[in-house]
Design a protein with these regions (language model features):
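Core beta-strand residues in small-molecule sensory/regulatory alpha/beta domains
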Residues: 76, 196-209
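Short hydrophobic alpha-helical membrane-entry/anchor segments
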Residues: 150-158
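Non-catalytic propeptide/linker segments at domain boundaries
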Residues: 68-71, 75-102
Length: 223
């Protein structure tokens, strides 16, 4: 069970690093490589991503003995294909901010956490992580990092991966579930919407969004 939860976390982190970072930066057409270190799932992690024409074309997280990469919409774990990311933006309003490290996951916002203060619509996206194997076959760490890569936020999604696997384990016929269906709504704070944003996510195990797994609300800061 512990091994399973770890892999799910990894997949989510990978999906996260690519998409929001690319859409939030207004860059020149020159290719740019960004590297930094952070802590993910309690381990020191080295993060690298490449930007070309304002889009992330490659991302890699090295944490301990595991190397998770995103090439296009494919996530690889130690060189083996782990998942495919499918994104369906519902709405999007581009924000121009200065490139720096990238989006950093926060439990709180500098300007507070009152929902009514987040008045600037940023994006609404269906982002699905189609895993190669049953969701329950992955470790917490691996799933956590995959979520990070999919959502383009540097941070720890260990609690989310744990909740996902815990809830899915109680569902009947859970061996059939291979895809995580995420519905993500991002809103910017009224004071500085391009730098401080609230992310609300709901997670399902079916494409019709009928079988609810869990939800998560966090904040991201550009830094």
């Amino acid at each position: 069970m512990k091994k399973l939860i770890s892999l799910v976390c990894t997949a989510s982190i990978m999906a996260s690093i690519l998409a929001p970072v690319a859409s939030a930066i207004n860059l020149s057409n020159e290719a740019q490589t960004v590297r930094y270190s952070t802590e993910i799932t309690g381990k020191q992690a080295d993060v690298e991503y490449r930007l070309e024409n304002g889009e992330v074309t490659y991302a890699k997280i090295t944490a301990g003995e595991n190397v998770t990469e995103r090439i296009g919409n494919i996530i690889y774990l130690n060189g083996v294909k782990m998942a495919t990311i499918h994104e369906e933006p519902a709405n999007y309003e581009d924000e121009t901010v200065q490139p720096c490290t990238g989006w950093m996951k926060q439990d709180k916002c500098l300007y507070g956490t009152v929902p009514a203060d987040y008045t600037k619509p940023i994006s609404e996206t269906n982002r699905n992580i189609e895993l190669e194997n049953n969701i329950m076959s992955y470790t917490i760490d691996a799933l956590s990092i995959a979520i990070t890569i999919a959502f383009g936020v540097s941070g720890d999604f260990l609690d989310l991966a744990t909740d996902l696997l815990k809830n899915i384990s109680t569902m009947a016929n859970n061996a059939q579930y291979k895809t995580l269906y995420f519905h993500e709504v991002i809103k910017g704070h009224k004071t500085l919407p391009s730098m401080w944003q609230q992310v609300n996510c709901k997670y399902y195990v079916d494409s019709a969004h009928k079988k609810f797994a869990c939800n998560d609300t966090f904040y991201r800061a550009w830094g």
